[in-house]
Curated annotation (Swiss-Prot):
Associates with the 50S ribosomal subunit. It holds the Pfam family MMR_HSR1. NCBIfam families: GTPase_EngA, small_GTP. Disulfide bonds: none annotated. This is GTPase Der. The keyword Translocase does not apply. CDD domains: EngA1, EngA2. InterPro entries: G_ENGA, GTP-bd, GTPase_Der, KH_dom-like, KH_dom-like_a/b, P-loop_NTPase, Small_GTP-bd. GO terms for molecular function: GTP binding; ribosome binding. GO terms for biological process: ribosome biogenesis. SUPFAM superfamilies: P-loop containing nucleoside triphosphate hydrolases. The keyword GTP-binding applies.
Amino acid sequence: MVLPTLAIVGRPNVGKSTIFNRILGERVSIVEDTPGVTRDRIYGTSEWLGKEFAVIDTGGIDLGDEPFLAQIKDQAEIAIDEADVILFLADIESGVTDADERVAQILYRAKKPVVLAVNKVDNPERRQDIYDFYSLGFGEPYPLSGTHGIGLGDVLDAVLAAFPSEDKSVEDDSIKFSLIGRPNVGKSSLVNAILGENRVIVSPIEGTTRDAIDTKFEAVDETFTMIDTAGIRKRGKVYENTEKYAVMRALRAIDRSDVVLFVINAEEGIREQDKKVAGYAHEAGRGIIIVVNKWDTVEKDNHTMKDFENLIRQEFQYLDYAPIIFVSAKTKQRLQSLPAMIVAVSENQTRRIQSSVLNDVLMDAITVTPTPTVNGKRLRIYYMTQVAVKPPTFVVFVNDPDLLHFSYERFLINQLRQAFDFSGTPIHIIARKRK
């Protein structure tokens, strides 16, 4: 599902990050957060009046040593690229500035819905001053206090009203996948190589609400959708080298994918940013295939591939379920194997196991390794049932959920993996007290 997206834009020091955090804090229920990205997060999901949407804080995107106005321009253009609705933030203390007018000019040309809000209206007596902001050309400005959260409900009501209507008429049962990884691991080359190897149905497919482009193709008797290839192709090096922007694009692609191809550069090995992006794919419960690209550039002996695989398993211990493939976008080495791997992982993501079969495996596991005792109290597991797919999720009914230690939960997951093919997908176990 493609979430409608709100981007917050405005010159520095108008309170974009405060409003961003307020919006994320206003959600009715906690939607999937962004693991691994905390203090410097620029992307999240929220909910207002039952409507889920994504939020981007363009102010969090550091564009380096660019001049002041150039940074504002680039941040506004990022918002235009990414958003369905733009929240244009000014502040009552500074009034209408030249920088505000510059942002307004860029947004006006974009022809995207804009909601104008004036922040820092902490004193009700200042509300009359917001009428100066009509001059920016976006209709009625909404008074807002980020510090106290006053006025945010009215702003979010306006945002929801401006989101495009959902088109539910198109059924799409293709397998959706994306390529993620830090800058310069060869994602763009892999995209082109994969599409070059397979029959593209329509290229490009324009997104319904923004100019991101997905690409459909056929292989191994299946239809695939490669998510957001425009994000890799269009902006290219301009923003690819801005780490936060690259991570944000990866998070958004992951949210829309069934299976994620996590790309590592064989020449450069594993970096910290690799771990951040991979961690989110894992936490989001997506199917994962680890793709080691540029394998043609590595000097090899009989142990090279095994050594690299061992390094991956050591650095990404939580991805022990993810298959690894060594490829070259340049020489097309092993690329023909990728579609079948994606299909297999997608099938494993949706695999359902009958409760009777599950409980046979559970009883065998408990016989081999009895449940632990904590402070003199033994964990008792009565039965297990599967409650969800994508990822496969199982509930175990027990005497006391607090007694199910992480290590025994991991043992049960390993037993499930030995009994059934869950390669490429995380498995979630939830402990519940038997009533």
